[in-house]
Curated annotation (Swiss-Prot):
Record's protein name: Isoleucine--tRNA ligase
GO molecular function: aminoacyl-tRNA deacylase activity; ATP binding; isoleucine-tRNA ligase activity; tRNA binding; zinc ion binding
Keyword line: Aminoacyl-tRNA synthetase, ATP-binding, Cytoplasm, Ligase, Metal-binding, Nucleotide-binding, Protein biosynthesis, Zinc
Broadest EC class assigned to this enzyme: ligase
Reactions listed under catalytic activity: tRNA(Ile) + L-isoleucine + ATP = L-isoleucyl-tRNA(Ile) + AMP + diphosphate
Enzyme Commission (EC) number: 6.1.1.5
Positions that bind Zn(2+): C902, C905, C922, C925
Binding site for ATP: K607
Note describing how the cofactor binds: Binds 1 zinc ion per subunit.
One GO term of the biological process aspect: isoleucyl-tRNA aminoacylation
Zinc-finger keyword on record: no
Length: 939
C-alpha cells in the first residue's frame, strides 16, 4: 500500500527561487500603489517621534556603492524604529548647487557670461540638477529605501534658497559674520576659494630651498647672542629660512622664530659667512648645504631676536624678525619665511605684529602687473625664476626637491594655493563660537565614540570658515556694503528678510537681477551689492533650519545624523557651526559614522583598477536584498569590504534564510491561527523551548537595532535559521509534522511554534531584507496588515516556565547530548554500518541527576536524537565497551538496529508487521493512519 497520501507533506506557493531582480521592482510598484509611506505615517501619527535627518548627497551622476551603504543603513534604522512603534519619518534630500554641476553644464553650453548669460546658465544648472535628482531617486527607491520620495528637500528649491539666506541673516545678526582679506585655499582651476572640506591632501614634488635673509645691523644682532670668547666672527651675517613655496617670497613680510627654541650663530670656515638657525637643526642644514667646516660662535633663545631687521633677499625692503609658536623643529632651519597673504599661520602671527597682508597673485594664479621681477608669471611655474633670482643675488644657500603632502582641489585634483582675497567668514572666535561648538560636541552621542575626539580636534584647530565663493550657480550672499567704509548696511536684518521673500518667489535670480535702488532708494549709490555666492557646505549645513525646523513632520534637533566618517570635517561640522551660531546648540542628539567601501584587498575602488562594485549591477543580478544583507553583515565602523566573491557568499546566506522561511510557510499549510493556535501550556516541551529561544533572539535583535549593531542582527538571525532551526528543531519536528494526524495536538503544537517563529522572524528581517520580508508576509496565514511595515515587533512569543523541569538549562544540556550522539552516528555512517541516523539505536548510561532529567522524555527522547530507539539506563549498567563523552555523567552505546523498518516513518521498530491490516507499519503509524493518533508531550 502507498502511504504517501497519509503524510502531511509541506507545500507552499512561496517560490524557492528568489528571482529578486524581477520580483523586487514588482514589490516597489505594489508599495507605490499602496502609498505605503503615507500609510505608515498615518498609522504612527501621534506616537513619539524618531528623526533621522538625511544628509544630502550631491545631485550629480549615478549612485555608487558608498551612496547605497549610506541609504541602506538609514533605512535599517527608520524601519526598525517604526517597528518599535515610533513615528519615524524619512525625508530624503539633495545638495543641488555648486561647482561640479557648473562644470557639467559648462561642457554643454559654455561658461556663464561668455556664450550664455548668467541667468541662462543658472537655469541650465537647475534643469541639470533636477534630472540628476530624478536619476538618483529612482536608484535609491530601487534599493528598497522607504521615504517621502515625492516630497524630498532640494537645496535649490526656492523656499530652501530663501531659508538659506534667512540662516545667513540670523548668523550675521548674532555677530558671527566677518569680512576680511584673509588667506584661503584657492583653486586656480575653479577660480574660487575652497572650504576646508573641499581640500584633499596628496603627495607632490616641490623645490625645497634654504634662503639667506641678510642682517641689517650685524653688530646689533651679535650683541644679542652669548658668545664664548667675545668673538663676533667674520663674513656676511644672515638668518636662514627654508621653504617649499619659493613663489611666495615676493609677498614676504617677516621671518618668524620660536621664542622658546635655542638658536645659534654658525661660523662657516670654508666660505667665510655667518648663519643664524636653530641649534637642533644646525647639523642637518650644514650637511645639506655641503659646509666643509663650521663652528658655533653664539647662542640665544629665539625671544632675544625679536625685532631684528633683515633685508628681503631680492626686494628693497626691510623685514622684521617676529615670534610665533607655530615654528617647529620638524624640518627646515627653525626660521620661517612669513607671508601673511599666503598662509593661515602667517596671517595669524602677522595680525599680532600688524604686518601687511600682501597678495601679489591674481585669481588666475598669475602675478599682478605691478609685481616687480615676476609680473604676469604663473605662480606654479615661477618657482624656477625665483630660484634664479636668489642665485643672482647670492641669497640661495641650498636647493633640492622633495616629495611632501600638499593640498589639492577635491574636484580638479590639482594643487591649490593660499591666497589672501576679500572674503566672507564665519568667525570661529568672534562671539565665542568655537567654545560654544566644543561644548555642544560634548552633549552629543558619537557612534563610534572616537568620533568625538576627532571632531573636537578639527573644531579646536580650524580657521575661520570662508563661506564666500566666486561662482555663478549658488545661493547669493545678499548683502549691501558701504563703498567707502566697507560696513554692512545698518538695516541689514530687514533687507535680508525682504530679499528672502523675493527669492522664495523667484529663486536666486531675484538677487542677481535686483536693482539695489528697489530696496535702498536714494542710498543705492553709496552701497555695493555683493556678487559672491555661498559655500555649498553652508547650503547643506543649514538643513537643520530649512528642513528640520520647517517641515511639520520633523523636529529640531534631530535624533540622529548618519554619514560617512569624512563628514566630521564636512556636513557634521558645517551643520554644527551654523546651528550653534544660530541657536547655541547642536542640530543632532547623536551622530553615527560609517567607513568607506574597499575591495577584498582593502584597496580604494576605482574604474582604472577595475574593482568597482556598482550597486546597479548587483541589483540587476543578485537583487537589492543581497546588497542590503551585505551591509548588515559588515561592521560599518571600519572599512567595508565588498567584492563579487563576498556578495556571492552573502547570496548563499540569503538562500539559507529564504529556505528556512519557505520551510516554515510550507509546514503552515492548512494552519489557521484563528482556529488552530495551541495555548502555550498545552504545547509540547520542544515547541515551548523553540518559542522561548525565538523570544531570546528577538530581545537581542531589538536591542541590536536600537544600538545600531546590524552585524549582530545578521549573526543572530543566521545562527537561529541554520543552527537552532535547521540543524535541530526543524530536523526533529519533521517526523511529527509529516506523520501525526493533521489536526492532532502534536502537529498543531508544532505548527503553532512555527507560526510564532515566522511572525517574529519576518519582522526581524523586514528592516534588512525588506523585499523578502514583504514577500513572506503575503504568504503567512491569518488576518494581517497589507504590509509588514504597518506592523510592530511581534508580541506573541513567550518564555519557558522557570519552574519547569524542561527549562533553558535542560535544553542546553539536551543539545549537547544530541551533539554527542550525532558525532557517534557519523562514525557509524562513515563505517557503512548505517545509512541514515534512524537506522541506529542508542543507549545512554547516565549518572542519577542526568538519568532523572532524561527520563522526563520517556520514549520521545528518540525523536530528539533522531534514532529509532533511545534508551536511558543507569551508569552502573555501562560495560567496558561504552563510549565516553565530554558530558559529565554520560556514556553511550550505539549500534545499527536489527528491527524492521516502517515504510511510513522509516523508524526501525519491534512492532512493525504486528498489525494485520498494515503489516508494513509500526504501531505508532497505525495509530496515526487508522486510529485516534499518537500522543506526544515532549518532542
Amino acid at each position: 500500500m502507498d502511504y504517501k497520501s497519509t503524510l502531511n507533506l509541506p507545500q507552499t506557493p512561496f517560490p524557492m527561487k528568489a528571482n529578486l531582480a524581477q520580483r523586487e521592482p514588482e514589490q516597489i510598484e505594489r508599495w507605490r500603489t499602496l502609498d505605503l509611506y503615507r500609510k505608515v505615517r498615518s498609522r504612527r501619527a501621534g506616537r513619539d517621534k524618531f528623526i533621522l535627518h538625511d544628509g544630502p548627497p550631491y545631485a550629480n551622476g549615478e549612485i555608487h556603492i558608498g551612496h547605497a551603504v549610506n541609504k541602506i543603513l538609514k533605512d535599517f534604522i527608520v524601519k526598525s524604529r517604526t517597528l518599535s512603534g515610533f513615528d519615524a519619518p524619512y525625508v530624503p534630500g539633495w545638495d543641488c548647487h555648486g561647482l561640479p554641476i557648473e562644470l557639467m553644464v559648462e561642457k554643454k553650453i559654455g561658461k556663464a557670461g561668455h556664450k550664455v548669460s548668467p541667468a541662462e546658465f543658472r537655469k541650465a544648472c537647475r534643469e541639470y540638477a533636477a534630472a540628476q535628482v530624478d536619476l538618483q531617486r529612482r536608484e535609491f527607491i530601487r534599493l528598497g529605501v522607504l521615504g517621502d520620495w515625492e516630497n524630498p528637500y532640494l537645496t535649490m528649491d526656492f523656499r530652501f534658497e530663501a531659508d538659506i539666506v534667512r540662516a545667513l541673516g540670523r548668523i550675521a545678526a548674532r555677530g558671527h559674520l566677518a569680512k576680511g582679506a584673509k588667506p584661503v585655499h584657492w583653486c586656480l582651476d575653479c577660480g574660487s576659494a575652497l572650504a576646508e572640506a573641499e581640500v584633499e591632501y596628496e603627495n607632490k614634488h616641490s623645490p625645497a630651498i634654504d634662503v639667506r635673509f641678510a642682517v641689517v645691523d650685524e653688530f646689533g644682532l651679535m650683541a644679542r647672542f652669548h658668545t664664548a670668547d667675545g668673538a663676533l666672527g667674520e663674513g656676511p651675517l644672515s638668518v636662514v629660512i627654508w621653504t617649499t613655496t619659493p613663489w611666495t617670497l615676493p609677498a614676504n613680510q617677516a621671518v618668524a622664530l620660536n621664542p622658546e627654541l635655542d638658536y645659534v650663530v654658525v661660523q662657516r670656515t670654508d666660505i667665510k659667512e655667518r648663519l643664524v638657525l636653530a641649534d637642533a637643526l644646525m647639523k642637518d642644514v650644514m650637511l645639506r648645504c655641503g659646509a666643509e667646516g663650521y663652528r658655533v660662535i653664539g647662542y640665544c633663545k629665539g625671544a632675544a631676536l625679536e625685532g631684528v631687521q633683515l633685508r628681503h633677499p631680492f626686494y628693497d625692503r626691510i623685514v622684521p624678525v617676529i615670534l610665533g609658536d607655530h615654528v617647529t623643529l620638524d624640518a627646515g632651519t627653525g626660521a620661517v619665511h612669513t607671508a601673511p597673504g599666503h598662509g593661515q599661520e602667517d596671517y595669524a602671527v602677522g595680525q599680532r605684529y600688524g604686518l601687511a597682508v600682501d597678495n601679489p597673485v591674481g585669481g588666475d594664479g598669475r602675478f599682478l602687473p605691478n609685481t616687480e621681477l615676476f609680473a604676469g608669471e604663473h605662480v606654479l611655474s615661477a618657482n624656477d625664476h625665483v630660484i634664479e633670482v636668489l642665485k643672482e643675488r647670492g641669497a640661495l644657500l641650498h636647493e633640492a626637491r622633495i616629495e611632501h603632502s600638499y593640498p589639492h582641489c577635491w574636484r580638479h585634483k590639482t594643487p591649490v594655493i593660499f591666497r589672501a582675497t576679500p572674503q566672507w567668514f564665519i568667525a570661529m572666535d568672534k562671539g565665542e563660537l568655537r567654545r560654544q561648538a566644543l561644548e555642544a560636541i560634548g552633549q552629543v552621542q558619537w557612534i563610534p565614540d572616537w568620533g568625538q575626539a576627532r571632531i573636537e580636534a578639527m573644531v579646536g584647530n580650524r580657521p575661520d570658515w570662508c563661506i564666500s565663493r566666486q561662482r555663478t550657480w549658488g545661493v547669493p550672499i545678499p548683502l549691501f556694503v558701504h563703498k567707502e567704509t566697507g560696513a554692512l548696511h545698518p538695516d541689514t536684518d530687514r533687507l535680508i528678510e525682504e530679499i528672502a521673500k523675493k527669492i522664495e518667489t523667484a529663486g536666486i535670480d531675484a538677487w542677481f537681477e535686483l536693482d539695489p535702488a528697489e530696496l535702498l532708494g536714494a542710498e543705492a549709490d553709496r552701497y555695493g551689492k555683493i556678487g559672491d555666492t555661498l559655500d555649498v557646505w553652508f547650503d547643506s549645513g543649514v538643513t537643520h533650519h530649512a528642513v528640520l525646523a520647517q517641515n511639520p513632520d520633523l523636529a529640531f534637533p534631530a535624533d540622529l545624523y548618519l554619514e560617512g566618517s569624512d563628514q566630521h570635517r564636512g556636513w557634521f561640522q558645517s551643520s554644527l557651526m551654523t546651528s550653534v551660531a544660530m541657536s547655541g546648540q547642536a542640530p543632532y542628539k547623536a551622530v553615527l559614522t560609517h567607513g568607506f567601501t574597499v575591495d577584498a584587498e582593502g584597496k580604494k575602488m576605482s574604474k582604472s583598477r577595475g574593482n568597482v562594485v556598482a550597486p546597479q549591477k548587483v541589483m540587476q543580478t543578485l537583487g537589492a536584498d543581497v546588497l542590503r544583507l551585505w551591509v548588515a553583515a559588515t561592521d560599518y565602523r571600519g572599512e567595508m569590504t565588498v567584492s563579487d566573491e563576498i556578495l556571492k557568499r552573502i547570496s548563499d546566506v540569503y538562500r539559507r534564510i529564504r529556505n528556512t522561511a519557505r520551510y516554515l510557510l510550507a509546514n503552515l499549510d492548512g494552519f489557521d491561527p484563528a482556529l488552530h493556535l495551541v495555548k502555550p501550556e498545552d504545547m509540547l516541551a520542544l515547541d515551548r523551548w523553540v518559542v522561548d529561544r525565538a523570544l531570546a533572539i528577538q530581545q537581542e535583535v531589538i536591542e541590536a537595532y536600537e544600538t545600531y549593531q546590524f552585524n549582530t542582527i545578521f549573526q543572530k538571525t543566521h545562527h537561529f535559521c541554520s543552527v537552532d532551526l535547521g540543524s535541530f528543531y526543524l530536523d526533529v519536528l519533521k517526523d511529527r509534522q509529516y506523520t501525526c494526524k493533521t489536526d492532532s495536538l502534536p502537529r498543531r503544537s508544532g505548527q503553532t511554534a512555527m507560526y510564532h517563529i515566522a511572525e517574529a522572524m519576518v519582522r526581524w528581517l523586514a528592516p534588512v531584507l525588506s523585499f523578502t520580508a514583504e514577500e513572506i508576509w503575503q504568504y503567512l496565514p491569518g488576518q494581517r496588515e497589507e504590509s509588514v511595515f504597518l506592523s510592530e515587533w511581534y508580541d506573541g512569543l513567550f518564555g519557558l516556565d522557570e519552574n519547569s523541569r524542561c527549562d533553558r538549562a535542560f535544553w542546553d544540556q539536551m543539545l549537547k547530548i544530541r551533539e554527542a550522539v550525532s558525532k557517534e552516528l557519523e562514525i557509524l555512517r562513515v563505517r557503512g554500518e548505517i545509512g541514515a541516523s534512524l537506522d541506529a539505536e542508542v543507549e545512554l548510561f547516565c549518572d542519577p541527576p542526568l538519568f532523572r532529567k532524561l527520563s522526563e522524555a520517556g520514549d520521545e527522547l528518540r525523536f530528539v536524537l533522531l534514532t529509532s530507539y533511545a534508551t536511558v539506563k543507569p551508569a552502573a549498567e555501562a560495560g567496558t565497551d561504552a563510549l565516553p563523552t565530554e558530558i559529565p555523567g554520560l556514556e553511550l552505546k550505539l549500534a545499527a538496529s536489527g528491527k524492521p523498518k516502517c515504510v511510513r516513518c522509516w523508524h526501525h521498530r519491534h512492532d512493525v508487521g504486528t498489525h494485520p491490516d498494515h503489516p508494513e507499519l509500526c504501531g505508532r503509524c497505525v495509530d496515526n493512519v487508522a486510529g485516534t493518533g499518537e500522543l506526544r508531550t515532549f518532542g
